[in-house]
Amino acid sequence: MLTVTQDMMLPTAITGSYPRPLWFDLSLNGRSFKSALGESLFREQYLDAVAAIINAQEAAGLDIVTDGDSRFDLAVGGKSWFFYPIERIDGIEGHRDTSRGWMSRHDLRPGKILWEVQEAYQPGIVKRKLERGPLEYTAIWQVAQRMTDRPVKFGAICAPALASMLWNEFYKED
């Protein structure tokens, strides 16, 4: 009989982003999260969306809840998952259109979801030394944690995936 996990709790949670309510139609559009919370319509929609998402998870009996990545803008194919930090890290300027080459190599055409995603994803250009920017992850987490007694987890893109969405014009390649 397996006894290694006999007394270990396996807490339940969701993975990935939660669908955005249709009435939540405002976005950060590159703004600071804290600044956006100062705008009454964004604040109301954001807080209502996070409360609804947390309540749904609690009603489902999940042990660890999430804000559903509600900070992300309405964008094609989850673009905001990459671009939330790209828009805020110092040293990144503008965008480079790499879509045509990528799409022709993979025989993609309009109407296919990967065409739409690739056309929307324009890598940010690293023009100078990358420096810390105002990601405000603590403030985003605190908003959600105030709405529940359960632990709140928080998702963010990992560094290797983020690097894959940047066009380097500053650092020497290895």
Each PLM stretch: what is its role?
Residues 1-174:
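Domain-level signal for soluble alpha/beta catalytic cores
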